[in-house]
Amino acid sequence: LGDVYKRQCESRVSDEVKIIVKKPENDYWAELDKKRITQVLEHFVMNALKYTSQGYIEITYEVKEAAVILSVTDTGCGIPSDKLNKVFDRFEKADSFVQGIGIGLSICKSIVEQMGGCIGVESELNAGSKFWIEVPCHPICCSEEKNSVYLMS
């Protein structure tokens, strides 16, 4: 989470947007595909930064049995309900005025599903959105594993 924050948030955040990183009390090591998890989270954060002009963006994770749930919540413009069920479809965008071609979230969905996980979104127009993934993982005791991720702020 710290890597995502440093790469995506530090240079792009305005005084109007607060970044919050939440994690459980205990640090957690898990065997995950670090490159792909980072790719998905960075896309969620980039979208949140793009659509949030004031308020906050919250990056969080929690451990649930043999899975990790990672989410990015924002207080941006939200997604219209008629477009909500299409946000993970290829070439779909919630807002035609924002730059991009609409494939980022479909790529995220594909990555998460290849890892055996699931992806979702909750949103309210003019109130914000929450994008989340739940991926299976195996806890490990140290960072020496090739694809391990240290889930900490």
What is each residue range found by the language model?
Residues 104, 108:
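Short alpha-helical Gxxx[C/S/T] motif in the catalytic ATP-binding
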Residues 79-91:
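Short conserved segment of the HATPase_c
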Residues 74:
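Acidic ATP/Mg2+-coordinating residue in the GHKL
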Residues 48-49:
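Short helix-loop "hinge" at the ATP-lid/N-box region of the Bergerat-fold HATPase_c
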Residues 1-5:
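Short, small-residue-biased leader/transition segments that mark boundaries at the very start
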Residues 16-28:
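Conserved catalytic submotifs in the C-terminal HATPase_c
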